[in-house]
Amino acid sequence: MRGEVCHIHIGQAGTQLGNSAWELYLLEHGLGADGRLDPEKGEDINAGGSFETFFTETGSGKYVPRSIFVDLDPSPIDEIRTGPYRQLFHPEQLISGKEDAANNYARGHYTVGKELVDTVVDRVRRLSDNCSSLQGFLVFHSFGGGTGSGFGALLLERLSTEYGKKSKLEFAVYPSPRVSTAVVEPYNAVLSTHSTIENSDCTFLVDNEAVYDICRRNLDIPRPSFEHLNRLIAQVVSSITSSLRFDGALNVDLNEFQTNLVPFPRIHYPLISYAPVISSNRSSHESFKVQDLTLQCAEPNNQMVVCDPRNGKYMAVALLYRGDCVPRDCTQAIASLKAKASFNLVEWCPTGFKVGINYQKPARVPGSELAPVDRSVSMLSNTTAISEAWSRLDHKFDLMYSKRAFVHWYVGEGMEEGEFSEAREDLAALEKDYEEVAGDSLDMEGEEAEY
């Protein structure tokens, strides 16, 4: 028994990411769209996978996901209620409001969100009572929207009071440098980050622009849709949890991510990269050796946030291998990665690598552009380069806030203006934390010289 994981999908981004993630989980476990075992898949799949982690089995042999979908706007959840997976989810796990948060953090956090949050916490309690040893929560939401930022922050506050000791990992869609879906994104993101720094154990950032570029460049999709993006992100989410569900040489559970990736409590924003992202018509010309995939993950253009890790230092890296891999190959691949000049580890963390190896091959969604492959690597790296992303965001926030543009919408929903400056100061402190961590080694040398 490896412990269960509850998924919580918040807002439109979280809900659509959830759709892609569950689509993939069903394939990996050989289940049909109604949550029953697919007779065509046969018995072989069932042998290796543990269903309990993500699914509750009912008396009639149906598997129900341990997940909750919440949105203040009814339409994304209605899509699930009428979509191909309407038989899969428990109707009580799909919670929608009457009016949306209108891209406004304050509506999601104070006015509209307040009415729904008790219902949601109650549903979470029911899910967790159903678990024999709950490992933790995976929370999916965006930082730019109203529900994702406001309600997401509110729910995480409640979760950390009720489930303080359980891991809470977030997958957050972060505002991109050039692709924007809302004018007030910088406000929402700064406010949301401020309130989740304390309440989340580890937050994996994904930004749409970076994933767009990966889809365009590697999958030859001229105009990628959100579905393409979500399917790619789902592969990473699946690798992170694959050890909980399938057997492997080195298994990794949720607590190990925190232990190995988060050197200081506030610095918990790892980057994600995934390889191989390749289309079916190119795959015959490529080598998928463990070493090649590992080096691909370290390339800036395979990362899911627009920032250049060559400008920063790595504090900790988790490499999750999946499929046909043996530990020896992985060790060699890591050695060659460490030898690269562009790969800088901080001096106070000499080992720096956590490895997971899982024997389950990456599954491929029928009709997706990703080529079927025998092995894949996900790299989660906590690097100081991510502070580039924070400073970009802070700069946009400052431009708008200097004129107090759009602030009245937030104040009108019961927020105080002081909260803006408080949140902004907190993020300035976060940037400072990252600078100090990167510069620590230099101070040490100065001190030694004095003695």
UniProtKB/Swiss-Prot annotation:
Its localization reads: Cytoplasm, Cytoskeleton
- SUPFAM superfamilies the record matches: Tubulin C-terminal domain-like, Tubulin nucleotide-binding domain-like
Which GO molecular function annotations are given, in alphabetical order?
A: GTP binding; hydrolase activity; metal ion binding; structural constituent of cytoskeleton
Report the active site residues.
E256
**Per UniProt, which keywords does this protein have?**
Cytoplasm, Cytoskeleton, GTP-binding, Hydrolase, Magnesium, Metal-binding, Microtubule, Nucleotide-binding
Q: Name one GO biological process term.
A: meiotic cell cycle
Coiled-coil region(s): none
For this UniProt entry, what's an example GO CC term? cytoplasm
The protein's predominant localisation is cytoplasm
InterPro entries on file:
Alpha_tubulin (IPR002452), Tub_FtsZ_C (IPR008280), Tubulin (IPR000217), Tubulin/FtsZ-like_C (IPR037103), Tubulin/FtsZ_2-layer-sand-dom (IPR018316), Tubulin/FtsZ_GTPase_sf (IPR036525), Tubulin_C (IPR023123), Tubulin_CS (IPR017975)
Q: What cofactor(s) does the depicted protein rely on?
A: Mg(2+)
Report which reactions are catalysed by this protein: GTP + H2O = GDP + phosphate + H(+)
Positions with a binding annotation for Mg(2+) = D73
Site Involved in polymerization: give positions.
Answer: Y451
Annotated positions binding GTP: Q12, D73, S142, G146, T147, T181, N208, N230
What EC identifiers does the entry list? 3.6.5.-
Q: Which Pfam families match?
A: Tubulin, Tubulin_C
The annotated subunit structure for this chain is:
Dimer of alpha and beta chains. A typical microtubule is a hollow water-filled tube with an outer diameter of 25 nm and an inner diameter of 15 nM. Alpha-beta heterodimers associate head-to-tail to form protofilaments running lengthwise along the microtubule wall with the beta-tubulin subunit facing the microtubule plus end conferring a structural polarity. Microtubules usually have 13 protofilaments but different protofilament numbers can be found in some organisms and specialized cells.
Role played: Tubulin is the major constituent of microtubules, a cylinder consisting of laterally associated linear protofilaments composed of alpha- and beta-tubulin heterodimers. Microtubules grow by the addition of GTP-tubulin dimers to the microtubule end, where a stabilizing cap forms. Below the cap, tubulin dimers are in GDP-bound state, owing to GTPase activity of alpha-tubulin.
Q: Which family does it belong to?
A: Belongs to the tubulin family.
- According to UniProt, the name of this protein is Tubulin alpha-2 chain
